[in-house]
């Protein structure tokens, strides 16, 4: 997310607060942080695959190797639709990586701007509990991609004789990725293997967040870097809630990280002031840079 996207998202945040009703705060966890027991290598690999979605599509072709993964397929132009790359990875299976906000695209920025909560899309609404709400802009962006993603997953799972599907995203791409991870678990044969999300904004209301926990909580891995402000929007009191168990890298871009159990854990990121720049949102995650359009192209897995 570049500076233009930052400004637009902040303005959208202000407008949403002024225009919309406030909701009672949902529960926030007070559990103490614990050591991260997940394997770190898949985070490192996943970060490189999502960084590559920010690179110019004309600069690489199918067959590109990134760590243990081979690039297979892409859709999206970063404008009308967010870019999505598919890879075949030894550690992750068929990996779906989704680009974050394109700061040079008004359409991409507007996905971040549309804060109003909506019902789940008709494609998957039957699987969601009554009362679940999803941020409109993120759902619009996902719905533009979902049919092509599902077709590609079926094709490459068959061709590669691969049962595992992993969803990866950064920033807006993490929000879209959370919807994709849920949808794949609910509607695709074989379901979801893992999801790795970096700099995740809030996507839905407490009913949605709790359904995420019940459905893919044991498969979801998501991380916040330093004083990144993006995971704090849409604001909690506007009715949005994160799923459980974020990993907080603090100080930002370091190798110091802890897992914060439960939803909206009060002992982690709420304890430090936000920094409204990209130094942490686009930074080093588990030894790999996610730098957006200003990052490393091709991505370098585990280079930091």
From Swiss-Prot:
Primary site of residence: secreted
Any one Gene Ontology molecular-function term assigned to this protein's record: hydrolase activity
Catalytic residues (positions): 171, 228, 281
Enzyme class: hydrolase
UniProt superkingdom: Eukaryota
Record-stated family: Belongs to the AB hydrolase superfamily. Lipase family. Class 3 subfamily.
The protein's name in its UniProt record: Secreted mono- and diacylglycerol lipase MDL4
Gene for this chain: MDL4
